[in-house]
Design a protein with these regions (language model features):
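Positively charged, helix-rich recognition surfaces that bind polyanionic ligands
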Residues: 1-186
């Protein structure tokens, strides 16, 4: 299966299905705000401040645990369904500069490491595609490259074969095709 990571949907699979992220950090922002406020209102060095800091740490730990649990469940589901999983090698640091908190909340790198670990315990193969491969801009039907495709265009029509393509599904199909080609050549 080919998988394309995204901001709107966590994963886009090559069959057109999408997997959304629960966005644990975003869901816990009010709780975090309250915990941070409690720390800032306490006097430095006091026992109440130490207690508030421990409480704040627990909130962050709970977010991390929820995200990690969801990643393991998703990785086990994907490994159970597919024998070969093709993903792209993402530039996480570059994405963090552009989208900040959203990328940190999605934690793509953590999911990829969990997916690789779960796959190593089974017969599933994880293939990483080069991050500079034009997965979104290539038509999966005829292979024409759409150089003028911008990030805002979510659906586009191929100039050569006139196929209407969803950007993310098309990228997932191209990732699967490139991953299988990379696997055959190795």
């Amino acid at each position: 299966v080919g998988m394309d990571f995204g901001l709107k949907h966590f994963l886009n699979l090559d069959d057109g299905s999408v997997i959304d992220s629960p966005q644990w950090y975003k869901a816990s922002l009010n709780e975090l705000r309250t915990a941070h406020r409690a720390v800032s209102r306490c006097q430095k060095g006091s026992n109440n401040r130490n207690r508030a800091i421990r409480n704040l740490g627990r909130v962050y730990q709970r977010i991390s645990n929820r995200r990690r649990d969801w990643f393991f469940k998703l990785a086990n589901q994907l490994v159970g369904e597919y024998a070969i999983i093709c993903i792209e090698d993402l530039n996480i640091d570059g994405m963090k500069r552009l989208w900040g908190r959203k990328i940190s909340d999605l934690a793509f790198a953590e999911f990829v490491s969990i997916l690789e670990w779960v796959a190593s315990n089974t017969d599933t193969t994880v293939v990483k595609i080069d991050r500079w491969a034009p997965s979104s801009k290539v038509c999966h039907v005829c292979g024409t490259i759409n150089a003028s495709l911008s990030l805002k265009q979510r659906i586009w029509e191929c100039e050569c074969c006139h196929t209407t393509l969803d950007r993310d599904t098309n990228a997932a199909i191209n990732i699967r095709r490139m991953g299988l080609a990379q696997l055959k050549s190795a």
